[in-house]
Structures are given as structure tokens and as C-alpha cells.
């Protein structure tokens, strides 16, 4: 495993879960966290610890986004009508990097962030290089013409380990995806259990 891959799996090791469902994740082979003290037996988590872990897991899944950005997303979810946890999932899944990853244009969420930063993605015909760009229902995301033959794109399309969720329509021949609707928790194909209700409890303390 390269240093780059190892860094990406640090989140898996820290949480002790294979949060992206990747076959190469080191937690498939061991049940302890990173570092020399990782093998120590972990005690039962407090309520705060359980809530914190739920937050870390959700943050980690979307590329370990910053606390400032994650809290801002939570606060927006809390201001909206309806269930705050469901709103939070909908907002996270409407991020451009999440949709590029879900559409299988790239193999990982980290690759999606870099891919967008490097200017390989259009939204509604215009180049967007902001990872956290919020998509609206009906928005069309496309890999730019000059980028469609990049090895990382061709590799990602062939990945069998995950499917494109039904709230995104994808044409892999044209490398175009349409964001059809805002998903709820039950719609999102997470590889592990996500508990946004515990994230709400964490921020409501």
C-alpha cells in the first residue's frame, strides 16, 4: 500500500471501521486503531463518546471535511424544516464532491475533491472547482471533455464494489450525471451504519 493510500485509510484505522467498503482497507485485517498503542482494549464509550464517534464517522466519509465546514452544514440542516438528521444527510449528499464520487467518475471521495480542484468538472456547462459546491435538483454534472480519458476516470467506472444510487442518473458513455432528488438516510448506500441523529445530539448538548 502506498503512502498516499495509507493516509486515506487512516480514518478507517482511527474509527476501526471500513467506512467506504474498500477491499484494501486495513481494518479488514485487524480490529484496532492506528499507532503503537492501537491494540489496547477499548473501554465502553460514554454517551458523549458515542455521539463524537458518529460525528467523526460522518465527517470522515466525506473526506474528513473541516469541523468549521461540517458544523456550518449542521446549522443549515437545523434551520430547515423537517428532521435535522435527514436534512444533514441531504446537504452532505448534495455536495459536488459527493456526487462526483457517487457517480463513479473517480474511485474515492478524496480523488473527487482533487478532481474538482483541478478543474475537471462542469456543472450545467460551466467549470466548477469548489468541492463543497451545493447542487440543486436537476443540476447536470459532467466530466470535461479533455478529462474523460484520464486513467483515474476509466478505472473508477469499472469498479464493481459500489453502485450508483438511484437519486443520481449517470451516463458513463458521456460521463454525465444528473442530480435527481435530495436523498434521505435510507436512500444513501453507506458501507457502514451512519447515525445522524447522534450527530444532532452532539451539537445539541
Swiss-Prot record:
MF terms per GO, please?
rRNA binding; structural constituent of ribosome
Transmembrane stretches, by residue range? none
Q: Which UniProt keywords apply?
A: Ribonucleoprotein, Ribosomal protein, RNA-binding, rRNA-binding
Pull one GO CC term from this UniProt entry: small ribosomal subunit
Residues in S4 RNA-binding domain copies = 94-157
Q: Which GO terms describe its biological process?
A: ribosomal small subunit biogenesis; translation
Which CDD domains does the entry link to? Answer: S4
Classify the source by domain of life.
Answer: Bacteria
Stretches the record annotates as Disordered: 19-45
Pfam families in UniProt: Ribosomal_S4, S4
Hydrolase in keyword set? no
What is the role of the protein in this entry? One of the primary rRNA binding proteins, it binds directly to 16S rRNA where it nucleates assembly of the body of the 30S subunit. With S5 and S12 plays an important role in translational accuracy.
Q: Which family does it belong to?
A: Belongs to the universal ribosomal protein uS4 family.
Q: How does it assemble?
A: Part of the 30S ribosomal subunit. Contacts protein S5. The interaction surface between S4 and S5 is involved in control of translational fidelity.
What name appears for this protein in its UniProt entry? Answer: Small ribosomal subunit protein uS4
